[in-house]
């Protein structure tokens, strides 16, 4: 009983991954409900984000990321891009920047 502390490096990575992937999925979901308000550039950035989340997304979330990325890219009118890799810290910052750009911070 008591407080559970995250001490191992693996546990810290797992906790950060869950936080970042969760924030990314929430942002993609919010964006999907506001497609008519988004520019083609913003749609492309959302597709790029989904592609970068792929390596960090376990299970079915990981299977859905390429689908989501391709859908956002198609809506943006761009072709499929390469699925790159980004560190979790970088992704966390990108998610926050996109939230601000899209105006989703005030809604949560």
From Swiss-Prot:
Top-level taxonomic group: Archaea
Name assigned to this protein: Uncharacterized protein AF_0789
Organism: Archaeoglobus fulgidus (strain ATCC 49558 / DSM 4304 / JCM 9628 / NBRC 100126 / VC-16)
